Amino acid sequence: MNDEGDLAQEDTTKDEANSTEGSRVNKLKRTRRKVTKPHLCSADGDEITMANSREMSRNQTADLSKPGSAESWSWHNAKDAQDQIPVVKSSLPSAGAPDAEFNPNTDHTRDNAQSLILPQLSSRMKHIKQEMAKNHLQFVRFEATDLHGVSRSKSIPAQFFQEKVIHGVFMPRGYLELMPNPKDNEVNHIRATCFNSDIVLMPELSTFRVLPWAERTARVICDTFTVTGEPLLTSPRYIAKRQLRQLQDAGFSLLSAFIYDFCIFGVPEVINSKTISFPASTLLSNHDQPFMQELVDGLYHTGANVESFSSSTRPGQMEICFLPEFGISSADNAFTLRTGVQEVARRYNYIASLVIETGFCNSGILSHSIWDVSGKTNMFYSGSGVERLTLTGKKWLAGLLKHSAALSCLMAPAVNCRKRYCKDSRDLKDSVPTTWGYNDNSCALNVKCHGEKGTQIENKLGSATANPYLVLAATVAAGLDGLQSSDGAAAESDESQDLYQPEPSEIPLKMEDALAALEQDECLKQALGETFIRYFVAMKKYELENEETDAEGNKFLEYFI
């Protein structure tokens, strides 16, 4: 995890911030770089050497139609498996580079990242071996997120961990892609050619953590690739990394944290719980102290620093806030919580849920701000001492407002989630306005100006059921479009108090309308990838066509954890 103790310098002058801000905004006019394909390297224990690319190409021509051939597709034909072992590594550097934690003080060019990957892999493997021996680990989970944000994993015996780090872990592609809903059997897609193929889970070793709530087990978060070494274009984590790279190319870095609501029930209380609830009640926060202490302590040991927790507004509902971190770490923390909270709950014979059957939806707020690449200057902070965003902040906010309809499709991905947008209205509407304000928790986009470190935008469009990687990626994509746009806030001076909107933005209440908005949003389609948008829309349309209202709550209760 990154040490963000020195995120900002209080003595940075306003003039310096404005001058650097202008130069960074100018970078946004450049053509976006293409994301390069991952490269292959090889390892012999702790000694890492570059593999001959032609040899690797020949090794990758195994007949995948034969049973069992996929598991050994690139090394059975190698001359010496100990000296020439292929490793699939992503070429994305900086905040999302495999085996490289984000350091805002480092020049993260693609060439530098590639040259650093090999020695870092050796160093991390040595450290991980020591951790495994110290904790007497028996298993390591190789985890990846599917489109729903559900963790899909394979557990590997500890003695095979290094081999799987080098070779990768194979998993059917259908597990992570077009799943109509998490409870459907994957064999429904057996006739689709792409679902008969395997993908490769390649671990990002910086995410290796011992799981306190699992017996002698660790986990590592993985990036997903095809068997030929191509990034899986539907991978939410890959999409988030790609957007963070685009943000860095523009001269900025993302500091963010998720705020999650979740509900805890005893098994008999799952339906129609009568639990009394008072927001931030000390008595309710301490109602089951051992459970919350184990959860928070466990999250800390997995690298997710919890800033606070409290009771929330609904029966049995708790709120948990993470500390802000740079790069992909905030989404990794949220991904860890989604699985960890239920695993800890089961130890206490509880059920943890992000959405429950009574119809209200837990929120998944992304609190974020944009900093310079060095991580020392908050580009949203005006320094005026009043509730005001900089020009960069106004343009970023304008982008979120502009794309709010499409964003809501990704951030409230189920019918129940969309009910929260009109919970205070009794009128039947097709859409509601996208609201924003300063220090107003009722708004969809809440701007908080609490000093330099605390000047941020809370994106409250999100439901806790949404995939955190998609929430982060879509937020960055919309914000970047706002920075590039010459409309709205771009026409204002930095001293203006009001954010000009050419057209009022609306959030559709029906899932069908939200899907249409996403399909029509050319900016998000380009940023997130047409392949991903096509898969996501197809999945949601299938759900709508086969919707079982009575079962929806149970689906979320059991799987969206």
Swiss-Prot record:
Family named by the database record: Belongs to the glutamine synthetase family.
Alphabetical list of PROSITE patterns matching this protein: GS_BETA_GRASP, GS_CATALYTIC
One cellular-component annotation, GO: plasma membrane
Subunit architecture: Dodecamer. Interacts with BFSP2 and VIM.
Phylogenetic placement of the source organism: Eukaryota, Metazoa, Chordata, Craniata, Vertebrata
Protein name according to UniProt: Lengsin
Location of the GS catalytic domain: 236-561
Region (Disordered): 1-78, 91-112
Originating species: Rattus norvegicus (Rat)
InterPro entries listed in its UniProt record: Gln_synt_N, Gln_synt_N_sf, Gln_synth/guanido_kin_cat_dom, Gln_synth_cat_dom
Tissues in which the protein is found: Expressed in lens.
Biased composition (Polar residues): 50-63
